[in-house]
Structures are given as C-alpha cells and as structure tokens.
C-alpha cells in the first residue's frame, strides 16, 4: 500500500472519525450531561447500592429499596474475571467520556466492516457516517440507553470478523469476532443482541447459498468452524454478564407467567410477554417513511410550531385569538401521529444512502443485495407490530420485491425496467395496504413470530427492530456507490436520481395533497376527549401535512447535493476518491443537522453540577430518617409509585422504577397493591404512605404531618411486623387462588401457599393458635445479604418474612442445617421451623455469579490465547497481505 492510499484509505478516515466523535457530543467535555429521565431513574436506583459498596467494598446482589426488594443484576452489577474486554473498554481510556467513546467505536467498527467487505477507505467512511447518524441511534445515546448503544456499536466488529472468516482470513476474522461478541454479550442488552443476530443469520445463509452454488463446501465449513469457536469463546468470556441476566429473565416480567389464567388467555404467556404488551411501541405503516423523510409523522411528540412553521402554521393562526395560553399550546403542539405513545425523534436513516441503494439496484442486484433487501423487508414488516399486515397477505408482501424486479426484466425493454420496478412495488404496497386497512382485527406476522420464533416473545417495542435498518442502509448504500464509482453511467444516474426523487415527492409532498395518509394519531382522540374544537384539530392536521412536505423538500435538497457530486464525477470533474469523501461529508452533515433539530443543546444537556447525587432529601424523608429507625417501608403516592425511583434513594420503597421488575411482584401490583388493599399493605410492611390529594387513603392510615411542599405523610394505625409465625395455613391447588385470596385473610395470622410449595417442606407446619411462649426475635437484619432470627415455637410453624423471595439466590438454615424457602403469600419468604428454640439464618448466595465468574475466566483465557495465535498468524502472513474482497 503506497503512502497516498494509506492517507486516503486509513489516515484521513480515522482522523475524520476522531473529530466527529469528539465534536458530536462536545458538551460532555464542557461539563454537561444529558437531560435524560431514564438516566436520572438509573442513578436513583443505583445510589443506595453504591453507598453499600462504599461500606462493604462490593456491589450487593440485592436491592431492598425497590419494590420491597429485587435482584440488582439489571441495576448495578460488577461481573468478575472478565479479562477479555470489548472495544469500548479500551477506547474509553482515550476519550474518557462515554458518548464520544461509543460513537467512535461505532464509526471505527462499521468502517472496519465495510473494509472487510472490500470497500475502499472513503466509501467505508461514508458508510460509517451513515451508520452512526441514524436518528434512532442518537436518540438511544441521548436517552442514556447505554446497553442498547454499546451492543449496536460493537456489533460491526463481529460482522467484520464474520466477513473476513468467510474470505479465509482466519487471523483477522477471529480477533474481530472475539471483540464483536464481547461487546454484543457484554453490552447488557439481550434484545439488541437478538436483533443483530438477524443480520448474522442472513449473512451466514447467503454464504451457505454461495458455497452450494460454487461447490466450495470445505472453505465454508472451515469458516463456520472458526466462527463457532470465536463466537463461543467470545460469549463465554462474558458469561459473568450473561448468566445472571438470563436467570433473572425467567423470573422477571420478560419471563413466563405462572398464573393459569394467563396461560389460558394467551399461551405465549407461558414463556414470555403478553402479546398486547409486547406489541406496544409499534411503528405505524406511515412511520416507515421517516427513514427517508424525517418529519413525515410529525417529528417529536411536542413541536414548537411557532418556531418550525411561523406564520404558515394553521394552528398558530387559529390559536392567536386565545392569547398566551393558545400560543403556549402552539409552541408544544402534539404533531406526532405515529404508532408509539410518544416520540423523541424519527427513524431517519438518510436520504443519500437511500438514493445510493436505488442507484446500485439500477446497476444490478446480486445475491448479497437480495439477501440484505429481504432481511430489511422482513424487518420492516416485523417492526410494524400491532400495525402489521394480515398473515394471509404476508406471502404476497414477501413476493412483492421479487415480482417487482423480475417481471419488468422479463417483459419490458431495459430502459423501462427500473421505472416499472419502482412503480410496481409502490403500487403493490399501496394496494395491499388498502386491502388490509384494519390491522387491529387481524392475525399478523408479529403474532406468529411471538408464538413460534424462539425468544422473540421476551421483548417488546417492535419498532426497535428498525435499528437493523441502520446497518442495512449504510451497507447497501455504499455497495451502490461503489458500483457507480467503478462504472459511472449518466443514464443509470438519472434513473436512480429520478426514482428516488419521485418516491419522495409522491409520499412526502403529494401524500398530504391527495390524502393518501390520514395525518391523524392517537393523540387526536385524547384531544377530542378534552373537548378541543374540531377546527383546531383540522388546523393541527394541516400543520402535520406542512411539516411532512417541508421535510420532504429538505430531503430533496440533500438528494440534489448528492446528485450534484455524482454528476461532477460523471463529467470527470471530480476524482472517485474525492467524490466518495464528498458524499461521506454530505451524509454526515445531513444526519448531524436532523439530529441537532431533534436534540437541541439547550433542551438536551444540563450542567453536571445541576444533577446533585444524592438529590436533596424531601422533608418527609428527613423526618422518617430521624424519627423512625425501626423496620418499615413506604409507598409514595404523591408521585407515580411504580414508575418513579426517586423515593427509593433514602428509604425502603414498596414501589420504585424498573423496566424488568419481578413478574410476581408486578402481578401483585396489578391485583392488590395498586388498589391499596390493607392485608397486602400490612404484609409488605408498608407503615407509611405519602400523598398529595390524588389518592383515597385507606382509613387504617392516619394523617401524621403535612409538609411545606404539600406532601402529607400517613402512618398505619396497627403495628408493622417484619417477621411472624403463621397460626394457620391455607393451601391452594393453584397459584391463581393464592394471589386472588390475599385480600380475604388477615395475613398476620394466615399464610397462603400452594400445594406444590407445601410439598417442598421437610416438615408439615401445624395450624394452631399461638401462645405467649412463641415468637420471633430479630438478631440481625441486613436486607442486602443476611437476616438472623431467634425463633421459639411449641410446634412446627411456618415462619414468614416480609421479604420478597427470589429462589435462585436466597437460602436458609435452621441451626446450621439447610432448609428450603418457599413462596408464601405469593411473594414472601416462608421457612418451616421445628418445635423449640432455633436460630434461623436467611442469607444471599449468588451461585450464578460464582458460576459465571468461573466460566468468564476460562473464556477470557481462551480468548487471549486465540487472539495471540491469530496475531501471530497475521504477522507471519503480513508480506502476503491482500485487501479483503467483496463477496459480489
């Protein structure tokens, strides 16, 4: 490689990626942080655990401050013995701030992937910019969804390794695969890893087809073996992260329901999420067009129409007579009309890469193109979720791209084929949409996937699948650009440009004129319920059309700029390398400007000093910390009790926030706790309630104090017990009966269990009135890891603790002899105690942590050994180095 190639193919692209990574999130280096509600919630959840670490030296595995107690693996978890790290770990030492790190890792990873696919440096740079500038990715980072972004931005390393392995470049392929799998598994987001595997599967299937066509089975099998080894070792090195997540998932709301009524209502609930919940946050059919027209469905949930449209805003003109209140509404108008409850931005993947995809297909569509196109087409259908097409139409939908491409090739002359393909595809899609215009009533592709596709029912938000389009958009786009630069053709250029412009005009500009789309969303029904006049709703709809049309015009503007660059190349006024760099710059600028509009600095960032941790205690928290040092829990009704972690910072909370809380506790909330039923409040030790007038407080809670901030503290009249001996057992054959009956008993005397749990006990507990000689003394209570009790009973009794049971971790001994803990009162811990005086120890032992640590150590050592051998192989063959080849 000569110096000029080294400069253009490596030095300049890497320098450009460094600059972009630093300046895209430059406020982080100025002392700012994202103003992200999810990040605040995470900090609130983690704070007590970090405080505990300061005292013990390690993060606890249990979080007693959330939902009466839950495992902390998905809050703050320190895996041990992971000696093989993902790329983020190493680059963090350079950039120091996480957003620039993750952005650079994504840029470099996709650059390496396209290089592995045989694309030169300038094109690989353009693909890297197209990849990271997808608006949805920026949305993830700004929302501080670090797990999602780390998986997605390390996945390209694995894809690069995959590509190199199938080219016979074992050494580089193994190293990159190891890095990729470390990031995909260690990124703590199984949903993103699962979606990325769609791409892996599609690529491997393509290579399988290629091996069959060329009869190259031996290289394919060798590459597959290397892939299996590197993927297995990379995943094994992250076992300490993976195993606790997998185990906890079986007990969380992502796992199956044990309730028979749920399984009868929806068989999928035996293993995963409820179908309606799993399909929440689906992309509407119109929303797919935001991939090329960012504001087609209204932009964000609240848009400043005064700023965006000015005097051309119909809603603003209608609201001016209403004075300041009307203007305020226009400045935060609910313009979003897509499929989700709210939106912080679009799925914009770039009009320029889309144009390059069309341009590449005008040249030809090879087998890899078809593999990627069909992967994207299936992803689009699955992302629709609740808005998807009926399953009986799915075969026709899947055939549509193939029919649209091959019918014109068979029956029409060459000049007309691209136009006919575009026309057939758009017309066919439109007709299918008209045939199936009521998706709520049909059995859809997503329903089938939830029932039959392994693990698919563990995840919600089908629109999240569109993250895969970021990979496909950039990959296919750069393949198209390479074809053009290798063989510039004015005729093909004008056809590609014309088809792309026609699609934008038909959808973005004429779609509103001819009412091909409704431009109405779920927010409109809520506004009608609030008696908003129909004339204002009509004006809002008109503004949505205007936003879509202006956004389409902006897409046409960037399309014209990209077309101008390629036209200069056609006329040989611009060299191929400079043209590729210019396209890369335009892709970057387009994405940067769109994302800056969605996430303006003034509303996206806040100074780090303005985020105090811990937050200042509220008056009721200060009062309770100083006035009551015994055991109790609170239920903060002055806020959203089950979606706010702030009250969990200083006190043990029966509520809180977590996107994957324990399944049984969620069912308890839905059935009893949200209704404030007294027996359940008492069994959970909820001594205090806080309220500000929004809830009807149970009469057994007395008003104690009203603080200056308007929060009233209520205290339970009866004493709160932490642990007790059950006088009587109520045994049910079905777990549903146990849950449903909790409100019917005095749970300080009765214990409700299932026949299945009763059979786990070594001794049958007796039902008899307690006498004065029987009782429980708390010797030590450390809810993080150990509880020590002295129990006196004259007969075998069931000891009940007001602690949430998690079977994998919590163990018990009676006088040093291990004894089982069973579910009691649906969620609590129950232990049988024989007659006499005994010492009961309840302790946390994370077997999965220990097992994962051992496996990670083995996997890490194997990874380093593989990497050392692979590095040696690379150096040995350095003199024979050849650039990677594109599979096409």
Please identify what each model-predicted range represents.
Residues 110-119, 159-162, 166, 361, ...:
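Transmembrane-helix signature of membrane-embedded glycosylation machinery that interfaces
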Residues 100-118, 355-356, 476, 563:
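Transmembrane-helix motifs of polytopic, lipid-linked glycan transferases
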Residues 9-45, 229-244, 378, 426-433, ...:
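Transmembrane signal-anchor helices characteristic of membrane glycosylation enzymes that use polyprenol
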Residues 128, 144-154, 165-182, 190-192, ...:
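Contiguous transmembrane helix-bundle modules in multi-pass membrane proteins
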Residues 257, 261, 573, 585, ...:
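Extracytoplasmic
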Residues 19-113, 129-152, 266-351, 385-389, ...:
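Membrane-interface coil-to-helix junctions
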Residues 222-283:
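Polar, glycine-rich mid-to-C-terminal structural blocks
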Residues 655, 749-888:
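Active-site-proximal, structured, solvent-exposed surfaces of multi-pass membrane proteins
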């Amino acid at each position: 490689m000569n110096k000029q190639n080294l400069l253009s193919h490596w030095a300049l692209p890497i320098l450009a990626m460094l600059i972009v990574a630093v300046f895209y999130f430059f406020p982080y280096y100025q002392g700012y942080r994202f103003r992200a509600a999810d990040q605040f919630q995470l900090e609130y959840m983690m704070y007590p655990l970090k405080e505990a670490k300061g005292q013990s030296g390690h993060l606890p595995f249990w979080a007693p401050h959330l939902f009466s107690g839950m495992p902390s693996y998905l809050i703050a978890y320190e895996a041990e013995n992971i000696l093989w790290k993902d790329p983020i770990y190493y680059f963090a030492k350079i950039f120091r701030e996480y957003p620039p790190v993750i952005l650079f890792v994504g840029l470099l990873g996709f650059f390496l992937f396209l290089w592995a696919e045989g694309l030169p440096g300038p094109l690989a740079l353009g693909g890297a910019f197209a990849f990271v500038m997808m608006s949805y990715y920026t949305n993830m980072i700004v929302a501080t969804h670090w797990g999602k972004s780390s998986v997605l931005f390390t996945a390209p390393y694995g894809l690069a390794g995959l590509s190199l392995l199938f080219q016979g470049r074992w050494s580089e392929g193994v190293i990159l695969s190891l890095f990729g799998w470390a990031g995909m598994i260690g990124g703590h987001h199984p949903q993103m890893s699962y979606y990325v595997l769609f791409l892996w599967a599609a690529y491997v299937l393509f290579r399988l087809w290629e091996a069959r066509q060329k009869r190259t089975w031996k290289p394919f099998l060798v590459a597959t073996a290397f892939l299996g080894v590197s993927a297995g070792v990379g995943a094994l090195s992250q076992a300490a992260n993976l195993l606790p997540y997998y185990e906890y998932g079986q007990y969380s709301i992502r796992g199956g329901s044990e309730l028979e009524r749920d399984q009868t209502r929806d068989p999928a609930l035996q293993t995963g999420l409820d179908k309606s919940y799993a399909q929440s946050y689906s992309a509407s059919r119109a929303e797919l067009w935001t991939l090329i027209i960012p504001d087609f469905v209204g932009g964000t949930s609240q848009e400043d129409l005064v700023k965006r449209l000015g005097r051309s805003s119909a809603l603003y003109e209608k609201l001016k007579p209403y004075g300041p209140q009307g203007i305020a509404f226009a400045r935060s108008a609910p313009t979003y009309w897509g499929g989700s409850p709210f939106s912080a931005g679009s799925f914009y993947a770039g009009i320029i890469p889309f144009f390059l995809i069309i341009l590449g297909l005008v040249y030809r569509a090879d087998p890899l193109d078809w593999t990627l196109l069909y992967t994207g087409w299936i992803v689009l259908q699955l992302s629709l979720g609740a808005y998807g097409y009926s399953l009986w139409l799915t075969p026709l939908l899947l055939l549509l791209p193939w029919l649209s491409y091959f019918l014109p090739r068979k029956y029409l002359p060459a000049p007309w084929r691209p136009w006919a393909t575009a026309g057939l595809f758009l017309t066919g899609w439109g007709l299918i949409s008209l045939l199936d215009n009521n998706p709520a009533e049909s059995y859809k592709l997503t329903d089938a996937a939830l029932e039959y596709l392994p693990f698919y029912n563990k995840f919600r938000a089908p629109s999240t699948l569109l993250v895969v389009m970021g990979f496909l958009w950039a990959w296919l786009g750069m393949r198209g650009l390479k074809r053009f630069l290798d063989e510039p053709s004015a005729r093909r250029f004008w056809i590609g440009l014309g088809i792309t412009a026609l699609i934008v005009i038909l959808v973005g500009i004429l779609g509103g004129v001819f009412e091909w789309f409704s431009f109405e969303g779920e927010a409109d029904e809520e506004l009608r319920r609030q008696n908003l006049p129909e004339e204002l709703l009509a004006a809002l709809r008109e503004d949505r059309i205007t936003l879509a049309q202006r956004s389409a015009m902006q897409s046409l503007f960037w399309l014209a700029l990209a077309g101008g660059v390629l036209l200069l190349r056609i006329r040989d006024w611009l060299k191929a390398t400079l043209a590729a760099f210019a396209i890369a710059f335009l892709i970057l600028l387009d994405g940067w400007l769109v994302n800056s509009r969605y996430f303006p600095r003034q509303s996206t960032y806040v100074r780090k000093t303005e985020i105090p941790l811990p937050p200042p205690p509220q008056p009721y928290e200060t009062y309770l910390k100083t006035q009551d040092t015994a055991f109790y829990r609170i239920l903060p009704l002055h806020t959203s009790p089950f979606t706010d972690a702030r009250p969990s910072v200083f006190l043990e909370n029966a509520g809180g926030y977590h996107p994957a809380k324990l399944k049984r506790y969620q069912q308890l909330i839905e059935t009893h706790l949200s209704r404030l039923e007294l027996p359940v409040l008492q069994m959970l030790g909820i001594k205090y309630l806080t309220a500000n007038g929004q809830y009807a407080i149970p009469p057994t809670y007395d008003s104690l104090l009203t603080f200056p901030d308007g929060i009233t503290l209520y205290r339970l009249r009866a004493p709160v017990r932490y642990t007790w001996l059950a006088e009587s057992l109520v045994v049910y054959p079905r777990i549903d009966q146990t849950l449903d009956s909790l409100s019917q008993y005095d749970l300080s005397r009765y214990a409700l269990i299932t026949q299945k749990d009763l059979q786990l006990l070594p001794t049958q507990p007796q039902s008899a009135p307690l006498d004065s000689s029987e009782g429980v003394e708390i010797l030590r209570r450390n809810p993080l890891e150990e509880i020590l009790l002295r129990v006196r009973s004259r007969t075998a009794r069931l000891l009940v603790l007001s602690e949430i049971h998690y079977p994998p971790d919590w163990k018990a001994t009676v006088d040093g002899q291990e004894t089982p803990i069973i579910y009691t009162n649906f969620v609590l811990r129950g232990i049988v105690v024989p007659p006499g005086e005994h010492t009961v120890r309840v302790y946390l032992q994370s077997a999965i942590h220990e097992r994962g640590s051992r496996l990670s150590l083995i996997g890490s050592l194997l990874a380093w050994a593989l990497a050392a051998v692979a590095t040696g192989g690379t150096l040995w063959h350095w003199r024979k180095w050849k650039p990677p080849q594109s599979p096409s």
